[in-house]
């Protein structure tokens, strides 16, 4: 016990920003799921020093930078305890897709994934995969999702850590199943999951 007290008093643990490195790990793994080959060390250099890794594409670098900015925004928002809205989710998606999003012109109209616009076309899970919700049903589904999540946040027992984690996982699952955007759904819904965890004091 004396050794532990002396260790804490020394301030050694304050020399490392564990929260920053945890956040960089979340970002690196989330973009890796989407095909990024940038490592945690490379992201640290990119985020902190502006040094890009040799052999990594501009798209990969921008994907990681955008997600970092979205995480900073989302974690700050989580402290304000505001209700989830469609506009907030669109803002998250816009930040995630800021430099890698694209404008689309389809039968349903024009939309821009870099602006967080909800998709106006139908999408499937890969070529020949299962189709997601029809695009015409997406706006109501996202609004209903926000209503559900707000109700859950209000009533959950924050001392029940397992229940809080389950809620964050279910929020991710429900939103990614709706697949509101044409691209960036995985990154945005994982970010939402982490925002819920932040809001509930888990991370």
What are the functions of these language-model segments?
Residues 1-203:
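FIC/Doc superfamily catalytic core
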């Amino acid at each position: 016990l004396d050794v532990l007290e002396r260790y804490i008093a020394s301030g050694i643990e304050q020399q490392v920003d564990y929260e920053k490195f945890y956040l960089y790990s979340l970002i690196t793994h989330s973009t890796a799921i989407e095909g990024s080959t940038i490592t945690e060390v490379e992201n640290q250099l990119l985020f902190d020093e502006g040094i890009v890794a040799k052999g990594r594409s501009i798209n990969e670098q921008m994907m990681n930078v955008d997600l970092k900015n979205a995480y900073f925004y989302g974690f700050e928002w989580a402290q304000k305890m505001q209700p989830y809205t469609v506009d907030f989710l669109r803002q998250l998606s816009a930040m995630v897709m800021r430099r890698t999003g694209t404008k689309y012109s389809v039968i349903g109209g024009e939309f821009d994934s870099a602006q967080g616009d909800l998709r106006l076309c139908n999408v499937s899970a890969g070529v020949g995969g299962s189709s997601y919700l029809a695009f015409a049903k997406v706006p109501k589904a996202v609004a209903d999702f926000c209503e559900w999540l707000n109700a859950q946040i209000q009533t959950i027992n924050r001392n029940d850590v397992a229940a809080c984690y389950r809620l964050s996982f279910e929020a991710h699952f429900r939103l990614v199943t709706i697949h509101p955007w044409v691209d960036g759904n995985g990154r945005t819904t994982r970010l939402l999951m982490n925002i819920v965890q932040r809001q509930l004091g888990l991370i």
